Amino acid sequence: MEELRTLPEYLKASNADGTVILQATATWCSQCKAIAPFVEKLVKQFPEAKFYKYDTDSAGDIAQELGVSQMPVFTIFQNGDLEETVTGARGKALEETIRKVYKGEVRQGDGE
């Protein structure tokens, strides 16, 4: 998963065509680490979606732009429009939310 480090990188990624999922994370965030394997499954399950992460400590301007105050937070864009936000390490909720927005091929995955 590519890491966004600057506000211009975020703007380019979030305005891309298709489905874009941004994950707010931090090195000290235990829930972020706990959900990481599940997110990797989602990357494979939704191959046409673009997944990015950003560290709220080193890329605080991105977190501020999105109003992130807790983690993990997943912000889902479709064709440049912010569609949904999922807060917390809630794998099933994240998967269901991506399914609502995503328009591409879905590969079979067992979710959790």
Residue ranges and their predicted role:
Residues 9-10, 62:
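Short alpha-helical segment
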Residues 3, 11-41:
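Local sequence-structure signature of Cys/Sec-based thiol-disulfide redox active-site neighborhoods
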Residues 66-75:
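Structural micro-motif
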Residues 4-5, 24, 36-61, 68:
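Thiol-based oxidoreductase modules, predominantly thioredoxin-like and allied folds used
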Residues 17-20, 47-50, 70, 82:
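Core residues of folded domains in eukaryotic genome-function proteins
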Residues 1, 111-112:
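N-terminal targeting signals for export/organelle localization
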